[in-house]
Amino acid sequence: MTEATLAEWHPLGAIDEFTEDEPAARVAGQKPIAVFRIGDELFAMHDLCSHGHARLSEGYVEDGCVECPLHQGLIDIRTGAPKCAPITEPVRVYPIRIVDGQVEVNVG
């Protein structure tokens, strides 16, 4: 791995900080990130809806989707794909890894 590749991974916090009950808002590489936990898996996506630019970390989570708090459109947490109107454009998702109990995201 090159230094540039290593630099793209940013710390988000300890794995215990992330619960299924509540999405978490973080900033990594000057980008707003929403972190979601589904069971034992963690997912990260850009923390702005592609339709109304609302914070997805403030949305309601159910059945693997987050509901935009502004217009109630649904976005698949795993893929960022829009699931219903008014959202038509996907939201960028980011890879996550866990290193020694710490969650990291690659925003490169």
Swiss-Prot record:
Gene Ontology biological process terms from the UniProt entry: anthranilate catabolic process
UniProt KW keywords: 2Fe-2S, Aromatic hydrocarbons catabolism, Electron transport, Iron, Iron-sulfur, Metal-binding, Transport
Pathway membership: Aromatic compound metabolism; anthranilate degradation via hydroxylation; catechol from anthranilate: step 1/1
Matching CDD domains: Rieske_RO_ferredoxin (cd03528)
Binding site for [2Fe-2S] cluster: 49, 51, 68, 71
Signal peptide: none
Required cofactor(s): [2Fe-2S] cluster
Pfam families named among the record's database cross-references: Rieske
Induction statement: Expression is positively regulated by the transcriptional regulator AndR.
Matches recorded under InterPro entries: Rieske_2Fe-2S, Rieske_2Fe-2S_sf
SUPFAM superfamilies, per the entry: ISP domain (SSF50022)
Residue ranges occupied by any Rieske domain in the UniProt entry: 9-105
Gene3D superfamilies xrefs: Rieske [2Fe-2S] iron-sulphur domain
Cofactor note as given: Binds 1 [2Fe-2S] cluster per subunit.
Gene Ontology MF term list: 2 iron, 2 sulfur cluster binding; metal ion binding
Family: Belongs to the bacterial ring-hydroxylating dioxygenase ferredoxin component family.
PANTHER family reported in the protein's UniProt record: FERREDOXIN-RELATED, RIESKE DOMAIN-CONTAINING PROTEIN
The protein's assembly and partners: Part of a multicomponent enzyme system composed of a reductase (AndAa), a ferredoxin (AndAb) and a two-subunit oxygenase component (AndAc and AndAd).
Reported function: Part of the multicomponent anthranilate dioxygenase, that converts anthranilate to catechol. This protein seems to be a 2Fe-2S ferredoxin.
The name this protein goes by in its record: Anthranilate 1,2-dioxygenase ferredoxin subunit
Lineage, broadest ranks: Bacteria, Pseudomonadati, Pseudomonadota, Betaproteobacteria, Burkholderiales
